[in-house]
């Protein structure tokens, strides 16, 4: 028997050990069951990240932009939840939700007197009013 043919590389041994030990560890009941944190169960804190991670669907875009988004009105949160829980990939809708919610509101007309911004814009460059 040739001694060089019986040598096994450490990489092969490591790979075999991983293949033998990893599947039982992943299939064990302790690894599969992830208990809900107390704050989420009692609703004492915001569990948005936990809900994103454990909900159904593709949440990559929502998780990546979670820290960049400003807290919005409750309607925005509800729309995000509907997008996340629906089937399919809604990355484009999720990524543009913050932009749409942060859009400038339409200007409302002033009641009664003229608006200060209008009065300032109607002054001629020489300092005389164009009114």
Swiss-Prot record:
Disulphide bond pairs: 39-45, 40-47
InterPro entries recorded: Orexin
GO cellular component: cytoplasmic vesicle; perinuclear region of cytoplasm; rough endoplasmic reticulum; synapse
Region of interest (Disordered), residue spans: 104-131
GO MF annotation, one: neuropeptide hormone activity
UniProt-listed GO biological process terms: eating behavior; neuropeptide signaling pathway; positive regulation of cold-induced thermogenesis; positive regulation of transmission of nerve impulse; regulation of neurotransmitter secretion; response to starvation; sleep; temperature homeostasis
Family named by the database record: Belongs to the orexin family.
Protein name: Hypocretin neuropeptide precursor
Organism, as annotated: Bos taurus
Gene: HCRT
